[in-house]
């Protein structure tokens, strides 16, 4: 027989059944005014949220371990869990408590995960929450599919396995899905991205199913217009992506109606090291400011900020988009940007409101904010009706899409109060005059106070009890209260409802009839409001495509206005794109350093020129530490990036040829988490650059070789410089502390020497931060040490030691050509075994053919 003590209670049976469907997710189980978590979930939540862990009663013969959070505080706790990379299933009571036999019916209504956030309280205004799925293909390739649920566009891509880390850095997902059957080596590549990641069942990554899902999602018959029909690995990733996104939202995603296929050759490569070293969106300390993005972002809306960040991190090699933005900015600079920016202020985040509307999660006050924004845009449209002549093409398209969809504003105004309650469950949302039945029910509630006062007056007159009161509370409903001293005057038709210490509370047939009517009206009014709200959401679904277009246009206009404002305020110039290979910058400045100097009163930024061309592709940069070599290199890269985005640049003039990548090897820091030493990281990044850079790439090499011994470092630096000059032929800024490398340009005509100037005054040094032709005469390292506060005895000792070392080097220096090409190795003789290996394609062999080939190779090996 089953021991009753070992069986679970009905409520725990319900919980365990729900938990079984979400084994890897924290389940928040609604019980009254709290969300409870049980057993292992409770222990985990208590640890992560710092909430109390308790044990109450028993179920299945064991104490029930539990913890809970108030329902009205849920969003704050969710935000903390999401930040920690956790996912949470929200389980609500959906049944009627009054009619339920046993536990009230409950079900999971949504799953909140780091990559599928839609709640305003959980999202960063300036950043997307991105869900990425990756599928490993059969031939050393993989497919990627990603989306932001609030943005409404699916992205597909194919890449080689060894390019995966670059793609992960580019997409920067909040959550990553991958096939549980991937190889260990592939899984290790995925773990370079520090985000929430989960292995999903292999059947979810189905290429044919993914293609069908894309067709259904986009409501098209073919993917040919996107040239996306043959991307089988990406289709497999899309299958898992869409299935997971729909599962977390508990419904389809009707607002996701865009598709973009991103191809490797379309974007300018910005590896993770480049994004980090140039401090595009985060400082080297991991802070949001001061960065290039924080300097540029004067957008009036969150969606404008997100669009601007996307532009900054995804510049295209094709110049058409950048040129269109430059033309739009030029027009906005001439006057309209100030007026437009004033009108953009106060606009709501239409993009995220539209997504929440499509998912039926939108709140009443968000609908009011949407209506107010549409009102503002309608007024702007009417004012701009006669100003469209002469607009650049990009602005023309934007203003066309900014038209509010006809009827949407009026519908919102008819249904929703100007100042509604925060949630529909509280009532007070639907406008007066919208629905006659609701108005009638509200009238009953409104007349309640008048009826109670009138009844109180009549009962006082009838009973002679002067202090008699007619009142209401949520526990006991309506009642007539009589004090103890007046109880002898109570009529026979009063029925006792509650006894207090100093009074009795009664109800009469008349008051009971009114109570039934009033309470019924309140419940019916709330139910009616909820029904009307659902009807409104139904009608608004038809406007989602137009609202999505409007949101994209509004975001683009906001971002363009921000770039126009920055160009005027910071005195930036328009770059010029040319076909010949060149980076020609006159009076260039580092935008972030210049802004910081202006803020802190640190003086004026020293502008510098940079000229790289087909004739001179490399600069060997020498000069003192603290002189500004790294700043100069970074500013060149930032100017190239800004121009490629379609922004004005911090320079007097800029001519730019084709660019396909910006690579940086600047500074070094131990990657302890991945067990990489400083020098190993330095060499790894250098190797990646040497393998991937092309003649159209910009390469920044700062102090390469400093992580090892002097001779090793010098030899490696010389070899790397020669490879970049002779083989890669990339535009290269090569800063070094090895003065032997100043001899490099004498033997390599595509390189020139430049140096950062400084002057000495006695034992002191003044940095001029100016780039001048020719090599530096010395490094001034000891002078820098003195500036840093190193004790004078150490400085004096160092000066004597330096003098002795320089004398010794002059006398004994070996005459070694650092830059001579290595002797050519003898051409290897190809053996029969080599030829046999060359003819084998492992991917096409059957098991029997593979075995035969193995025996043949063994035979040839014995003969060799």
From Swiss-Prot:
It comes from the Bacteria. Gene3D superfamilies: 1.10.1420.10, 6.10.140.430, DNA repair protein MutS, domain I, MutS, connector domain, P-loop containing nucleotide triphosphate hydrolases. InterPro entries: DNA_mismatch_repair_MutS, DNA_mismatch_repair_MutS-lik_N, DNA_mismatch_repair_MutS/MSH, DNA_mismatch_repair_MutS_C, DNA_mismatch_repair_MutS_clamp, DNA_mismatch_repair_MutS_core, DNA_mismatch_repair_MutS_N, DNA_mismatch_repair_MutS_sf. PROSITE patterns: DNA_MISMATCH_REPAIR_2. ATP binds at residues 623-630. GO terms for molecular function: ATP binding; ATP-dependent DNA damage sensor activity; damaged DNA binding; mismatched DNA binding. Keywords: ATP-binding, DNA damage, DNA repair, DNA-binding, Nucleotide-binding. GO terms for cellular component: cytosol. One of its GO terms (biological process) is mismatch repair. It holds the Pfam family MutS_III. Belongs to the DNA mismatch repair MutS family. PANTHER family: DNA MISMATCH REPAIR PROTEIN MSH1, MITOCHONDRIAL, DNA MISMATCH REPAIR PROTEIN MUTS FAMILY MEMBER. This protein is involved in the repair of mismatches in DNA. It is possible that it carries out the mismatch recognition step. This protein has a weak ATPase activity. NCBIfam families: mutS1 (TIGR01070), PRK05399.1 (NF003810). This is DNA mismatch repair protein MutS. It comes from Polaromonas sp. (strain JS666 / ATCC BAA-500). The gene is mutS.
